[in-house]
């Protein structure tokens, strides 16, 4: 019998500057060590933190950029099975409507950069981001979609659409 994997709940926040470039973090720690990713982090489940509260907190902690819940649009919820073979993730993906004004200073988790969407296609990013999260962002960032992804190691990521709001 395969041992059960833990389930983690987290947010990703897609931030842009006024030029439409995306803020990404070159991660210096797992998960996603050594690759570029949107900012985010785990919910503080012990205090009953909501995904919106977590997105606001993580944005402030990682970038120093102050946002409010009404600056956020929840555009996707994705259940990732067996991510990196380590755990399952329930991810809430937010687009921040408020442009970030400047590149944040480096933090313990890594260093920041602004990138156009075309430049991101050439960056070292997690395979799940390349094949699932960024295509989801491109297609649904102004709507809402619920998906699940099988991220088992050694196999291509399989994404299944479970629900979508009408356009």
How would you describe each model-predicted region?
Residues 21-61, 157-167:
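Conserved Nudix-box catalytic region and its N-terminal flanking loop in Nudix hydrolases
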Residues 19, 80-103, 130, 134-140:
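Active-site-adjacent beta-strand/loop module that shapes the phosphate/pyrophosphate-binding cleft
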């Amino acid at each position: 019998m395969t041992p059960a994997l833990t389930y983690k709940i987290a947010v990703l926040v897609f931030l842009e500057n006024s030029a439409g470039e995306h803020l990404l973090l070159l991660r210096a720690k797992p998960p996603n060590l050594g690759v570029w990713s949107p900012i985010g982090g785990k919910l503080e489940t012990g205090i009953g933190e909501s995904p919106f509260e977590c997105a606001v907190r993580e944005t402030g902690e990682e970038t120093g950029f102050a946002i409010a819940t009404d600056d956020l649009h929840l555009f996707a919820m994705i259940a990732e099975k067996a991510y990196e073979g380590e755990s399952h993730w329930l991810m809430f993906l937010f687009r921040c409507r408020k442009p970030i004004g400047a590149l944040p200073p480096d933090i313990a988790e890594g260093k920041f950069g602004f990138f156009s969407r075309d430049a991101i296609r050439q960056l070292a990013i997690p395979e799940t981001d390349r094949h699932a999260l960024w295509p989801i962002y491109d297609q649904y960032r102004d709507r809402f979609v619920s998906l699940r992804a099988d991220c088992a190691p050694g196999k291509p990521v399989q994404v299944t659409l479970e629900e979508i709001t009408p356009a």
